[in-house]
Design a protein with these regions (language model features):
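Conserved helicase RecA-like core
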Residues: 1-171
């Protein structure tokens, strides 16, 4: 059981969605989600740098205009990736929670948690990267059966409801 001490506010202009699937299908579900939603700008959160790099490379292989910021990236590499994302040269930024701290990028339409955040503060931080100003936004979590209990605790604690969506099984 996860206990959340203080009830933090989540922007009411954020739509919360979860997509239930297996760990094995995570990348394919991400790819299908990006193709279906066609986000103006999306940040994809991944929990570790090795996987982060692999996800970015796979997205690029599938012709998704993506870039990544790594925890161990140089200041120049980080700035180059952020500039590319801000200027619209790419519309998907793959990042870890730590790398995304303090980012203020306008017009991020979608937040996608490839790894479900097991800490409520992480979810608040991730979701808070979208729906800035007067904009609305979407926060999508790709989850497995083991994440459902945590997701339900977030719904209760934050007073939100996740819409469960299915992705088409074909290509």
């Amino acid at each position: 059981i996860i206990k959340i001490e203080n009830k933090s506010e989540i922007n009411p202009r954020i739509e919360h969605i979860c997509i239930l699937g297996s760990l094995r299908d995570r990348f394919e579900n991400l790819r299908k989600l990006l193709a279906a939603e066609q986000p103006k700008r999306a940040i994809v959160f991944v929990n570790n740098n090795t996987e982060l790099r692999q996800i970015n490379e796979k997205l690029q292989y599938h012709k998704v205009k993506s870039t990544a910021i790594y925890g161990n990236a140089s200041k120049e590499e980080r700035q180059r990736a952020l500039d590319s994302f801000r200027r619209g040269k790419c519309n998907v930024l793959v990042s870890s929670d730590l790398s995304a701290r303090g980012l203020d990028i306008p017009e991020v339409s979608h937040i996608i948690s490839l790894d479900f955040p097991v800490n409520p503060d992480e979810y608040l931080h991730r979701a808070g990267r979208t729906a800035r100003g007067d904009n609305s936004g979407v926060s999508v979590c790709l989850i497995t059966n083991k994440d459902i209990e945590i997701l339900q605790s977030y719904e209760k604690a934050f007073g939100i409801e996740f819409t469960v969506k299915k992705l088409y099984g074909g290509k």
